[in-house]
Amino acid sequence: MANLRKTHPLLKIANDALVDLPTPSNISAWWNFGSLLGLCLISQIITGLFLAMHYTSDISTAFSSVAHICRDVNYGWLIRNLHANGASFFFICLYLHIARGLYYGSYLYKETWNIGVVLFLLVMMTAFVGYVLPWGQMSFWGATVITNLLSAVPYVGDSLVQWIWGGFSVDNATLTRFFAFHFLFPFVVAGATMIHLLFLHETGSNNPVGLNSDADKIPFHPYFSYKDLLGFIIMLTALTMLALFYPNLLGDPDNFTPANPMVTPPHIKPEWYFLFAYAILRSIPNKLGGVLALLSSILVLMVVPILHTSKQRGLTFRPASQLLFWILVADMLVLTWIGGMPVEHPYIIIGQVASVLYFSLFLVLNPLVGWLENKMMNW
């Protein structure tokens, strides 16, 4: 009799994706981040569900309900710290996962890549609406500033902002709908993840040398299931350490003050994982231009496959392109630093230079160097 795992309609799907999946034998630890992102999503949904049981999405009680969770609910402080810092780990894994895709040319699987970019945008939206929920000062003013950017849309901008706010300012209606969105989006993300995996399994995984690996495949289980398990243990250990020893390290002190529409914080800034995009937004002294640059900073990822000029897939054997890749990493770090700094000299000009470099690397320098490397190979 055939194994149930291989014949049962439901189990067969899981088996083909997680057990008998033919996997390149040489994929490195950089291929762990996909499963780590899955773990982050599951952990965020579970902790978020328990937080939602005690949270109230009303401006008069939201801040107090979060304090109540931390003080009075059994292990509420732990659940909240795991959820807040879990978001940081989610984005760390996301950036490393995208960086891996850029380095090894995984973006040439166009459907998988583009759904990945959509997933990235969805996770960013989820994190943004979630940051508003504790209704602290930075929650309120972050929501005000970022939603206000939509007023830059020609003709319909102001109506659009008021429609999202549900009134003439960020108020109770805004908080209530943001809670609804924050509850819904993770499930949309989970659905999109399934499509992401569906397209990935049409082609199979890429690998560090960027060559066809059909001749050298091994089953996912036990080899990579255990390798992923090691990654899980490392990440969960790091998350637990952060949540227990330094729970407020990455948060903003302003969020310990309840939201007050009459007092503006001296420096309005988002969570650390949005600072690079925020720096690009602020680098352009025009509202609509800034909003377009902000959108482009993420959507530029969608044109990467179109601008691939090299005859080789990854950067493994392309030192000049490797240099550009690490310049991009450094540039992202500089933008992250600038995003958290006040708008004054010399930060303004540093941010503008870093922003120009960011787009130049994607749109001009990388395709150019890829083309040059082809010429050098023929030489």
Swiss-Prot record:
A ubiquinone binds at H201. Heme b b566 binds at H97, H196. Keywords: Electron transport, Heme, Iron, Membrane, Metal-binding, Mitochondrion, Mitochondrion inner membrane, Respiratory chain, Transmembrane, Transmembrane helix, Transport, Ubiquinone. PROSITE patterns: CYTB_CTER (PS51003), CYTB_NTER (PS51002). Binds 2 heme b groups non-covalently. GO terms for biological process: mitochondrial electron transport, ubiquinol to cytochrome c. Heme b b562 binds at H83, H182. It is a multi-pass membrane protein. GO terms for cellular component: mitochondrial inner membrane; respiratory chain complex III. Its main location: mitochondrion. It is found in: Mitochondrion inner membrane. Gene3D superfamilies: Cytochrome Bc1 Complex, Chain C (1.20.810.10). Belongs to the cytochrome b family. Heme 1 (or BL or b562) is low-potential and absorbs at about 562 nm, and heme 2 (or BH or b566) is high-potential and absorbs at about 566 nm. This is Cytochrome b. It comes from Anguilla marmorata. The lineage of its organism: Eukaryota, Metazoa, Chordata, Craniata, Vertebrata.
